[in-house]
């Protein structure tokens, strides 16, 4: 059984004080983790504060990125080893904004995936799709290649634990979500790619999320799809009330 995962990605938003206020506001308002798992990826500056404030909570505190080396002369980077020692369970890898603004290549993303696994955490691997590639009919080739490249050299034992997010960049921050059918199509394609690389059994156990303008008013339709196991929400995860609604989508 795949436990739904409702995850937020704050990107470069909020202050330490606001992060603590968010944790306080959602306490007792989220489902139990064995029913619906919830997580928020936050800037590295806030992680320890959030972990401390959330000591008794069900919310998972996640990282937005990390480097592929555990330590060394890499000014400004975040060590995956340090994240693990802090108690961070998830790290986002391969978000379209990291690919676009920081020139992260498939090779870099693959090395980051392996670093996250090496340090006992779980990657939330993001797969991008541009509108140009969708209209040009290159969607399948593009998404398959991203998944395959990110998992190069990753064992089946590790791959079975990964979370993959289908995030069409034409929907991110646009206010226009993919339709539930489009989300299902993308998530199904990712699952089939995992089956081709590893096995049907492994693919059927991996959680695949949808991300891109997810809101309380469209999450129920997305979560009704058989291959959509959760969401990776951006803007709607910044507001406490909105995030609580996302997490409790079954009541909407």
Swiss-Prot record:
> Which keywords fit this entry according to its UniProt record?
Cytoplasm, Gluconeogenesis, Glycolysis, Isomerase
In which compartments does the protein localize? Cytoplasm
Q: Which reaction does it catalyse?
A: D-glyceraldehyde 3-phosphate = dihydroxyacetone phosphate
**Out of the domains of life, which is the source?**
Bacteria
- To which pathway does this protein belong? Carbohydrate biosynthesis; gluconeogenesis; Carbohydrate degradation; glycolysis; D-glyceraldehyde 3-phosphate from glycerone phosphate: step 1/1
Kindly list the positions annotated as binding substrate: 9-11, 173, 213, 234-235
List, alphabetically, the GO terms of the cellular component aspect. cytosol
Q: List the CDD domains hit by this protein, alphabetically.
A: TIM
Q: What is its main location?
A: cytoplasm
Which residues does the entry assign to the active site, renumbered to this chain?
95 (electrophile), 167 (proton acceptor)
Q: Name one Pfam family in it.
A: TIM
Output the Gene3D superfamilies linked to this UniProt entry.
Answer: Aldolase class I
Which GO-annotated molecular functions does the record name?
Answer: triose-phosphate isomerase activity
Q: What is its EC number?
A: 5.3.1.1
Q: Which PROSITE patterns match?
A: TIM_1, TIM_2
Going by the record, the broad EC class of this enzyme is: isomerase
For the biological process aspect of GO, one term held by this record is: glyceraldehyde-3-phosphate biosynthetic process
S-S bridge residues? none
Q: Does the keyword Thylakoid apply?
A: no
Q: Which family does it belong to?
A: Belongs to the triosephosphate isomerase family.
Q: How does it assemble?
A: Homodimer.
HAMAP family per the UniProt record, alphabetical: TIM_B
Function, as annotated, reads: Involved in the gluconeogenesis. Catalyzes stereospecifically the conversion of dihydroxyacetone phosphate (DHAP) to D-glyceraldehyde-3-phosphate (G3P).
Query: What name goes with this protein?
Result: Triosephosphate isomerase
């Amino acid at each position: 059984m795949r436990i739904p995962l409702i995850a937020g990605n704050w990107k470069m938003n909020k202050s330490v004080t606001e992060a603590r206020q968010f944790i306080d506001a959602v306490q007792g308002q989220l489902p139990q983790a064995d029913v619906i798992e919830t997580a928020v990826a936050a800037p590295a500056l806030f992680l320890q504060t959030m972990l401390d404030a959330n000591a008794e909570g069900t919310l998972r505190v996640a990282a937005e990125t990390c480097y592929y080396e555990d330590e060394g002369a890499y000014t400004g980077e975040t060590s995956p080893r340090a994240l693990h020692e802090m108690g961070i369970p998830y790290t986002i890898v391969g978000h379209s904004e990291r690919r676009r603004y920081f020139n992260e290549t498939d090779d870099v993303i693959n090395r980051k995936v392996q670093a996250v696994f090496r340090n006992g955490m779980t990657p939330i691997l993001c797969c991008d799709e541009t509108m140009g590639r969708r209209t040009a009919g290159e969607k399948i080739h593009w998404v398959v290649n991203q998944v395959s490249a990110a998992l190069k050299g990753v064992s089946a034992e590790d791959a079975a634990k990964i979370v993959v997010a289908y995030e069409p960049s034409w929907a991110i921050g646009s206010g226009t979500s993919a339709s539930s059918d489009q989300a299902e199509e993308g998530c199904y394609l990712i699952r089939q790619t995992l089956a081709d690389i590893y096995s049907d059994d492994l693919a059927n156990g991996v959680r695949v999320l949808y991300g891109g303008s997810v809101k309380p008013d469209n999450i129920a339709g997305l979560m009704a799809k058989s291959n959509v196991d959760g969401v990776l929400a951006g803007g709607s995860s910044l507001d406490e009330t909105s995030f609580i609604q996302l997490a409790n989508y079954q009541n909407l």
